[in-house]
Amino acid sequence: MPHHYILTLFGLLPVATNISTWWNFGSMLLTCLALQVLTGFFLAVHYTANINLAFSSIVHITRDVPYGWMMQNLHAIGASMFFICIYIHIARGLYYGSYLNKETWMSGITLLITLMATAFFGYVLPWGQMSFWAATVITNLLTAVPYLGTSLTTWLWGGFAINDPTLTRFFALHFILPFAIISLSSLHIILLHEEGSSNPLGTNPDIDKIPFHPYHTHKDLLLLTLMILLLLIIVSFSPDIFHDPDNFSKANPLVTPQHIKPELYFLFAYGILRSIPNKLGGALALVMSIMILFTIPFTHTAHLRPMTFRPLSQLMFWALISTFVTITWAATKPVEPPFIIISQVTSTLYFTFFLSIPILGWVENKMMNIS
């Protein structure tokens, strides 16, 4: 029997017997993070943060560095996998009421914001056409901030336009933020295991717990193996499936792409931003699309923790998932009818879900006669 604190923490950690496959995504995210840090380090060794050499250095990595193509594709596609796992992880938290463990939820959403910032800075680094214009459009939103906007943008750019200082500081931020992510992840795990994870029934599992190892480690390994297998299949056979064709051209400030869009995992937020025809309004909606997740623990009024036995909340939850997918799809299309109205309707529905949580909880309590 291990007596060391760390071994005890991970090996003998008591976990509910009835947690399902949806609880596997935490360990998958940890694997994704390790993969990103590892591949990112080897890419940083060969990368040059200069606007004249950045694009060429990526070409050099993929062509000349041994297994450079694999590192580059694992890093890029691994980021997409990372965010897919994150969104499923958050959806599970919403469905099963994991957000009632407030400290864990708050640290998790802070982690999400840090991850989004890191991924955005990373997307700019290849200095391709779409990287440059996505950076221009998104950083330009800072000018919408009253009084301070222009100063903030100039400070972030390191000049009056996106140039060499911008790329240098984005590379520095992309390199340093993963250390903040590792720290926040550790905090997230510590806070989670202080109270213990939730379970599909939303009941107190203290009377029925088993050690994390070997039971849940073996269960986690199945999805983990499938995820790595899928990642390697995509890297080997369709490495450009998530890439934008415009990004295979070097950044040209004089030529605007026909349709500017960020990476796959940011499309829902970009769709919400684009649906509002006002710069400040769009920027606020973009920020609120993530920040609204902080409010959920305080708007929960239902007496039952998970949505397992709450049909109205289930209906709204699956409507949210459909809305999320539809916004993502609409954001890939040009800004023209009918995609404008689709984005506006789905963006409204997205925020409606979060506003309806307290009302639905109250109605369900009345329906089930829970006082």
Swiss-Prot record:
Parts of the chain that traverse the membrane: 25-45, 69-90, 105-125, 170-190, 218-238, 280-300, 312-332, 339-358
Claim: Transport is one of the keywords in the record: yes
Residues at which a ubiquinone binds: 193
Keyword annotations from UniProtKB, A to Z: Electron transport, Heme, Iron, Membrane, Metal-binding, Mitochondrion, Mitochondrion inner membrane, Respiratory chain, Transmembrane, Transmembrane helix, Transport, Ubiquinone
GO biological process assignments: mitochondrial electron transport, ubiquinol to cytochrome c
SUPFAM superfamilies, per the entry: a domain/subunit of cytochrome bc1 complex (Ubiquinol-cytochrome c reductase), Transmembrane di-heme cytochromes
Pfam families: Cytochrom_B_C, Cytochrome_B
Chain positions recorded as heme b b562 binding sites: 75, 174
GO MF annotation terms: metal ion binding; ubiquinol-cytochrome-c reductase activity
UniProt xrefs under InterPro entries: Cyt_b/b6_C, Cyt_b/b6_C_sf, Cyt_b/b6_N, Cytb/b6-like_sf, Cytochrome_b, Cytochrome_b_C_euk/bac, Cytochrome_b_N_euk/bac, Di-haem_cyt_TM
Record's subcellular location: Mitochondrion inner membrane
Alphabetized CDD domains for the sequence: cytochrome_b_C, Cytochrome_b_N
Gene Ontology CC terms: mitochondrial inner membrane; respiratory chain complex III
Cofactor: heme b
Record-listed heme b b566 binding positions: 89, 188
Biological role stated in the UniProt entry: Component of the ubiquinol-cytochrome c reductase complex (complex III or cytochrome b-c1 complex) that is part of the mitochondrial respiratory chain. The b-c1 complex mediates electron transfer from ubiquinol to cytochrome c. Contributes to the generation of a proton gradient across the mitochondrial membrane that is then used for ATP synthesis.
Other notes: Heme 1 (or BL or b562) is low-potential and absorbs at about 562 nm, and heme 2 (or BH or b566) is high-potential and absorbs at about 566 nm.
Subunit record text: The cytochrome bc1 complex contains 3 respiratory subunits (MT-CYB, CYC1 and UQCRFS1), 2 core proteins (UQCRC1 and UQCRC2) and probably 6 low-molecular weight proteins.
Family the entry assigns: Belongs to the cytochrome b family.
Protein name (record): Cytochrome b
